[in-house]
Every structure is written in structure tokens, then in C-alpha cells.
Curated annotation (Swiss-Prot):
Domain of life from the UniProt record: Bacteria
InterPro entries assigned to the protein according to its UniProt record, in alphabetical order: Ribosomal_uL15 (IPR030878), Ribosomal_uL15/eL18_sf (IPR036227), Ribosomal_uL15_bac-type (IPR005749)
Gene name in the database record: rplO
Protein name, entry field: Large ribosomal subunit protein uL15
Region (Disordered): 1-60
Subunit note: Part of the 50S ribosomal subunit.
Organism lineage string: Bacteria, Pseudomonadati, Campylobacterota, Epsilonproteobacteria, Campylobacterales
Function: Binds to the 23S rRNA.
GO molecular function, one term: rRNA binding
GO cellular component: cytosolic large ribosomal subunit
Alphabetical keyword list: Ribonucleoprotein, Ribosomal protein, RNA-binding, rRNA-binding
Length: 133
């Protein structure tokens, strides 16, 4: 066996497609391009995402909106944290000891009856109360 005698296995290779070489080849006349029109011309390229008239995937799927970068405050009802209302000072840590909220919380808003009375006790700028008296 020598390198010059090596051949690929029978049927493992295909002849390249030779278009436009007569009707008998099966790839003559229109050269595998179908009939007339834009798609038969040279330089034709379908738009990215074009699916032949079918509604494209990017139009079939629903829009996904953006999420705001401005953090919304975590809202807590004053009635749920009555123990905190009795304290002299209200801080984020004192609320955390009584009420669970996500660790990613940057601001807390206290709402409900009595929230405005707590405004003087709050010693943390990350905590606010509802505006109603």
C-alpha cells in the first residue's frame, strides 16, 4: 500500500453540482433556480428573518419590555409591623427584625393608618411614609 494508491471508499464522495450544463443533467436551463422573477436573478438575497410570507418568528413572539432602572420602594403596611411602631427609632434593621423583605430592597415605603405619625421616628433616609395624614 502506497499513498498514491489510496482512494476514498466507494460512495463516500459526491461529484460537485455542475449547473447549466444541459437539460440531461437535471440542472440545465434554469440552473436549479426555479422559474423567472427576482429569486432567479443574480444578487438576490432574501431579507434576514424572511420566511416566505409566513409571519416571521420575531413578529410571532410577544414583545418583551424593558425593566426600569429606578428601583421601586418595597411597600409595607404599618399594621403588619406594630412592634416597630412602638420603638423610639425606626431603621431598616429594626423593620428587618420584624418583617421579611427581599435583600435587594433599597427603599421601604410605610403605608396605612398611622404611617404619617411614624414619620418623626424614622432615622433612615431609605424609609418613607405615605403622604396622607
Amino acid at each position: 500500500m502506497a499513498l498514491e494508491n489510496l482512494k476514498p471508499a466507494q460512495g463516500s464522495t459526491k461529484d460537485r453540482k455542475r449547473v447549466g450544463r444541459g437539460q440531461g443533467s437535471g440542472m440545465g436551463k434554469t440552473s436549479t433556480r426555479g422559474g423567472k422573477g427576482q429569486t432567479a436573478r443574480t444578487g438576490y438575497k432574501a431579507k434576514r428573518g424572511f420566511e416566505g410570507g409566513q409571519q416571521p418568528l420575531q413578529r410571532r413572539l410577544p414583545k418583551v419590555g424593558f425593566t426600569t432602572q429606578i428601583a421601586k420602594p418595597y411597600v409595607i403596611n404599618v399594621e403588619k409591623i406594630t412592634k416597630v411602631a412602638e420603638l423610639a427609632e425606626i431603621t431598616l434593621d429594626s423593620i428587618a427584625s420584624v418583617h421579611k423583605f427581599p435583600a435587594s430592597t433599597l427603599k421601604i415605603k410605610l403605608i396605612g393608618k398611622g404611617a404619617s405619625e411614624l414619620a418623626s421616628k424614622i432615622k433612615d433616609e431609605r424609609i418613607t411614609t405615605s403622604g396622607r395624614a
